[in-house]
């Protein structure tokens, strides 16, 4: 495996009134306002970054020129996003909300939006008549099949087409499935377990991914326990995972501070190759973009960061 060169933490973008210093991650972060919680970045072929802003219920849009705007209001608590090869935005909607004092009802569903026309279609909203609970994150294989997690529902599904749905993993074999990725050769599926309960699974699981879209031969790829597990992840052309994990302050769970906040670069063999510190809790997800696919966009707290990498990423 080619050794990863030193990643450089680039200047953090100033988004939604949050200012982050451009030097070392240890510097104090100045927060001008607190109005956002960023999640689920996805990058279009033209360099536009889409990400969810879960407190205000919006999907945001940042152009390659740095112009920030709202792509969609009332996002139905959208979380994980993906831009498919046809340039359509896939969204995991209706994700669970745990914000104190806020009680809202969302419709759990997977949608697909044409970025040119704005037309939105519902790809799936139930399995065998039972509604989803909290769709969280999504990825895609080379055949165009979508795989998504239902974190609170404890399941992983595959979408072969509109209303063509299969459940490939479920409790008790998995607990709280979060981020999901597929290897460049479509032979491995990676799944983040993010269970903050005492003794809960906090790891990346690896499975053999068969040609028919089913999985088997589960093994622990990387274990974050007893710290905070990863939330979301992306993958590069050499099969290395970039997992957004950890925390720098306790949040009332059994999770410890053993896992520091940052991006964990993990080889196909499950070895930690590099750690990229991110100076803000809570880190959530990341996605590759840029003309050479060597810019990693990272969502954490109220901020969208970007990091240059040596190896190009995949748009998954």
Regions inferred by a protein language model and the residue ranges of each:
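N-terminal secretory signal peptides that target proteins for export/translocation
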Residues: 1-6
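Hydrophobic alpha-helical segments, especially transmembrane helices
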Residues: 7-9, 24
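Bacterial N-terminal signal peptides
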Residues: 10-20
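Sequence-structural signature of mature extracellular/luminal beta-sheet repeat domains
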Residues: 25-316
């Amino acid at each position: 495996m080619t050794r990863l060169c030193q990643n450089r933490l680039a200047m953090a973008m100033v988004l939604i009134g949050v200012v982050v210093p451009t030097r070392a991650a240890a510097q104090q972060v100045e927060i001008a306002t607190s109005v956002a919680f960023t999640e689920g970045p996805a990058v279009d072929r033209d360099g536009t970054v889409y990400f969810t802003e879960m407190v205000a219920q919006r999907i945001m849009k940042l152009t390659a020129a740095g112009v920030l705007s709202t792509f969609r209001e009332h996002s139905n608590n959208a979380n994980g996003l993906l831009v498919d090869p046809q340039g359509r935005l896939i969204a995991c909607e209706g994700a669970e909300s745990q914000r104190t004092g806020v009680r809202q009802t969302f419709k759990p569903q997977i949608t697909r939006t044409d970025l040119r026309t704005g037309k939105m279609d519902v790809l799936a909203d139930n399995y065998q008549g039972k509604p989803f609970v909290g769709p969280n994150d999504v990825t895609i294989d080379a055949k165009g099949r979508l795989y998504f997690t239902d974190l609170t529902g404890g399941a992983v599904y595959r979408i072969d087409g509109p209303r063509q749905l299969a459940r490939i993993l479920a409790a008790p074999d998995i607990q709280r499935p979060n981020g999901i990725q597929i290897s460049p050769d479509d032979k491995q599926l990676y799944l983040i377990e993010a269970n903050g309960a005492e003794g809960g699974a906090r790891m990346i699981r690896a499975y053999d991914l068969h040609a028919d879209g089913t999985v088997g031969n589960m093994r622990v790829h990387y274990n974050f326990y007893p710290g905070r597990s990863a939330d979301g992840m992306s993958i590069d052309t050499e099969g290395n995972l970039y997992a957004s994990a950890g925390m720098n302050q306790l949040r009332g769970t059994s999770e410890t501070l053993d896992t520091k906040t940052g991006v964990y670069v993990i080889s196909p063999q499950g070895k930690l190759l590099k750690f990229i510190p991110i100076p803000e809790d809570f880190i959530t997800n990341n996605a590759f973009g840029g003309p050479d696919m060597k810019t990693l966009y990272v969502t954490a707290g109220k901020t969208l960061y970007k990091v240059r990498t040596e190896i190009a990423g995949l748009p998954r």
